[in-house]
C-alpha cells in the first residue's frame, strides 16, 4: 500500500561522549536485543583502540572511515517491457550513512578476532586506509553501477 507522504524521521539525541548524532545512530544500529549500554561500551572501547592505532581523535577517525565506506551510486531494479534492468541511481545522504553503518557492522561481525571491540576497531582502521570488507562492498556496488551505466536513461 502506497503512503500518502514520506514517513517522518524520528529525532535522535546526540551521544553523550562525542556529542554526535551520527555516532548515536551508529550505536543504535550496532545494538542487539535493546542492549544499548553494551553497544555503547563496544563502540567507545573500539574508538579508544582506534585512537591508539591511528593517533587521530575518535570522532575524526570514525567520520573518515564512514566517508570511505559511503556509496555514491547504487543499482535499483526497474522492470521495463518484460525485462528487469539494474538502473544506477544516486544514493540519498541519509541512505549513504545507513548503508555505510550496515556494511561496517556486518564486516566487523564476519571478521576474525577475539572480541567485537577489536574487530570493529580493526575494520574502522582498515576503512580509514581504504581497505577492508566494508570498503570492498562499496567498491562492488560502484562497479555494478558502472557496469549498468547504459541503463541510466531508465531512471525514474
UniProtKB/Swiss-Prot annotation:
Annotated GO biological process: translation
InterPro entries: Ribosomal_uS7, Ribosomal_uS7_bac/org-type, Ribosomal_uS7_CS, Ribosomal_uS7_dom, Ribosomal_uS7_dom_sf
Record's keyword terms, sorted: Ribonucleoprotein, Ribosomal protein, RNA-binding, rRNA-binding, tRNA-binding
PROSITE patterns, sorted: RIBOSOMAL_S7
CDD domains linked: uS7_Bacteria (cd14869)
One GO CC annotation: small ribosomal subunit
Gene3D superfamilies: Ribosomal protein S7 domain (1.10.455.10)
GO terms, molecular function: rRNA binding; structural constituent of ribosome; tRNA binding
Any single Pfam family the record assigns to this protein: Ribosomal_S7
Family as reported in the entry's similarity comment: Belongs to the universal ribosomal protein uS7 family.
Subunit comment: Part of the 30S ribosomal subunit. Contacts proteins S9 and S11.
Family matches, as PANTHER family: RIBOSOMAL PROTEIN S7
Function: One of the primary rRNA binding proteins, it binds directly to 16S rRNA where it nucleates assembly of the head domain of the 30S subunit. Is located at the subunit interface close to the decoding center, probably blocks exit of the E-site tRNA.
Protein name: Small ribosomal subunit protein uS7
Source organism per UniProt: Brachyspira hyodysenteriae (strain ATCC 49526 / WA1)
Gene name of the encoded protein: rpsG
